[in-house]
Structures are given as structure tokens and as C-alpha cells.
Amino acid sequence: MAEVKNKKASVATPEKETVVVQKDKAAALVKPQFNAQVDKRMLVEEVHQQAIFDSILSERASRRQGTHQVKNRAAVSGSGKKPWKQKGTGRARHSSRRSPIWVGGGRAFGPQSVKNYSLKVNKKVKQLAFRSALTMLVNDKAVLVEDFKMDKISTKDLSQKLKSLNVDKLRHVILVSENATVFKSSANLKNVTTLKAHSLNVETLVRADVLLVENESMKLLTERVLGSN
């Protein structure tokens, strides 16, 4: 038995090979590198993660409509008459058929439309978050300032333009433009989100794989960031 144990011990176990599973095919693509001329005053030396987190929470909360509402016992239709007398029937006492414990009665503590979901974030914190998110893109060399000159509405032409920049396969392409032709041309491109300069927010910058900005929009962004300091 001792010899058998020695034989088993002498057998070398093969080394396990590490297998890398690529879940997202788009993540395997090499993003192009852009060196955009961005005013250094728009950037920050240190990215503030907490400011980004607070601003995104505030932006998401502001998008909530808050139109949900249910009927409580005061709003539900029905008689307020007492179903039966208080004593003498042997049954439990009840005050109204509109009580929440009755079928068809009102909802107790249900959601009401008067609730306000907005979260206040200071202006300086919002600006710090915006500049931090922009700094992250600039550090990743994912910002390009270029005019998309389009004489007519054409999704094909815009798609070819994006292909020439090697960004057509990226998942989140953010295009900032004030041109209505560019807006309509990009409407059917699923991976392209077109916004105006005043509509660009922190969450959009954080989710972006690449940020394409026209010169006119870049001037507006610069005024927006530096004008509030």
C-alpha cells in the first residue's frame, strides 16, 4: 500500500490553463485615440468620483415624473354609511365599506403624486462633476472636435463618416451638434446619441465611449463651463 501511495504522489498534475471569456465583443475592439484641443480650464487635476455620483443621482431623480397615485379611502367611490350597527350582531365592527380592509376599499399608505423626488446638488458640485467626467474622456483620448458638414439628411453619409473615424462599432457614441441635419441623419443609428451642448449631462459623459463635438458646440460648452465659474 505504501508503494501505491508513492506512485500516486509521483504523478505530476498538469497546470490549469487560464481561460479568458470575452462577454462583450464591442469591448474587445480597440478604440481610436484622439487628441482634442480642449481648454485646460474646463478640466480638473483630480477626478471627483463623489461629485459624479451625486450629480447622476440628481439627474435621474429629476427625470422621474412622479405621476403615480392610488385612491385612498377618501378618494374611492362608495357609501360612507356604516355597514351594520356597532354592537349586537356578533360580527366585527366596521365603520365604512371604503375601509382599506374591505374588498374594493381604498389603499392604505399608497403612493401619491404629491411626492417630490428631486435631489438638490449645489451648482459648484454639478460643475465639478461635469468637468471631472469630461476630464476622464480627455485622459482616455476619447474626445474629437470636428465639424460634420452635411448638405442633406443622409444616414448613410453620416455612417460612413463615423466609419472613417473608426467609431462606428463602439456601443455609445455621443455626438454634440447644433445642426438639425446631423440630428435627423443620426436618428436611426442605435449606437449614436445626438445632443445639443446645453443638453449634455454628467451621466451621458460617463457612459460615452467617444465624444464627438462640433466646433460651434465646443464654444457653447466652453461658455457653459467657464461662464459659471
Swiss-Prot record:
Cross-referenced Pfam families: Ribosomal_L4
Biased composition (Basic residues): 82-97
Residues passing through the membrane, by range: none
One MF annotation (Gene Ontology) recorded for this entry: rRNA binding
Protein name per its UniProtKB record: Large ribosomal subunit protein uL4
Function: One of the primary rRNA binding proteins, this protein initially binds near the 5'-end of the 23S rRNA. It is important during the early stages of 50S assembly. It makes multiple contacts with different domains of the 23S rRNA in the assembled 50S subunit and ribosome. Forms part of the polypeptide exit tunnel.
Coiled-coil segments on the chain, per record: none
Keywords: Ribonucleoprotein, Ribosomal protein, RNA-binding, rRNA-binding
GO cellular component entries: ribonucleoprotein complex; ribosome
This protein's encoding gene: rplD
Family: Belongs to the universal ribosomal protein uL4 family.
Chain intervals for the UniProt region annotation (Disordered): 62-103
GO biological process per UniProt: translation
Complexes and interactors: Part of the 50S ribosomal subunit.
